[in-house]
Amino acid sequence: MSITTIIGPMFSGKTTEFIRLIERKKIAGKKCLIIKNYRDIRYDSDDNDKYHVTTHNNIIYRNCDIMFTDNLNKTSLIDTFQEKYDVIGIEEGFFFEGVTDFSNELANRGMEVIISTLESSYKQEIFSEIGKLIAISEDVIKLKAICMGCKISDASFTIRTIESDEKILVGGIDKYQSVCRKCLNLHKRKNTLSTESEQINNQTELSEPTRQKESLKIKKRRIDS
């Protein structure tokens, strides 16, 4: 039938839009299922109360069948869904390996697929799986947040505010912010200066002439940039 993909940075309202589209299908009499990943437990208070979708501003949606999995590479799942549901919603699609092929097969079998997902990492590197998904989607809805830096401009990017090199780190406002391009560049500049300061501090083990030489190099890079 079709694939609709909702993308945008964190805090841009992707889950709110996702819930809105699912609820419209419910009102139209469609049988709907939402798939969540086991890793996404940010707003689950306990194991007995996890079968819901929750937005960042704590709107809770339960008016739909919900299942948890971390593996979409099962033909049996698609066969079961085809028999029971008209609409399949996938929350936080970037968590799932194979989400593109899975969604494509569902759509080819006559189901509607609605996916909410980040399209890129905190380093502004696109998730390759989501790039493929966008290419085969009939509809792509790109949302923007409000910049948490200047609190004026629209935000199209997500930055991580804690030190971690993990590509995917589950979290909310405690670990991430949405920012505009200007604030993104300020953030990158701040991180660069922090790294350079660490390099200068690490030069205490070098000889005095070598330390002065390295310090001059770093200062020159700052001036040139």
From Swiss-Prot:
| Top enzyme category | transferase
One Pfam short name: TK
**Source species taxonomy:** Viruses, Varidnaviria, Bamfordvirae, Nucleocytoviricota, Megaviricetes
Compositionally biased spans, kind Polar residues: 197-207
UniProt keywords (A-Z) are: ATP-binding, DNA synthesis, Kinase, Metal-binding, Nucleotide-binding, Transferase, Zinc
Catalytic residues in the record? 92
Which amino acid positions bind substrate, per UniProt? 122, 167-171
Which first-to-last residue range defines the signal peptide? none
Provide the species name: Acanthamoeba polyphaga mimivirus (APMV)
Name of the protein described by the UniProt record: Thymidine kinase
Which residues are recorded as binding ATP?
A: 8-15
Give the reaction(s) catalysed. thymidine + ATP = dTMP + ADP + H(+)
**Compositional bias (Basic and acidic residues) spans?**
208-225
Q: Which family does it belong to?
A: Belongs to the thymidine kinase family.
Q: Which InterPro entries match?
A: P-loop_NTPase, Thymidine_kinase, Thymidine_kinase_CS
Q: Could you tell me the gene encoding this protein?
A: TK
Q: Does the keyword ATP-binding apply?
A: yes
Q: Biological process GO annotation list? A: DNA biosynthetic process; thymidine metabolic process
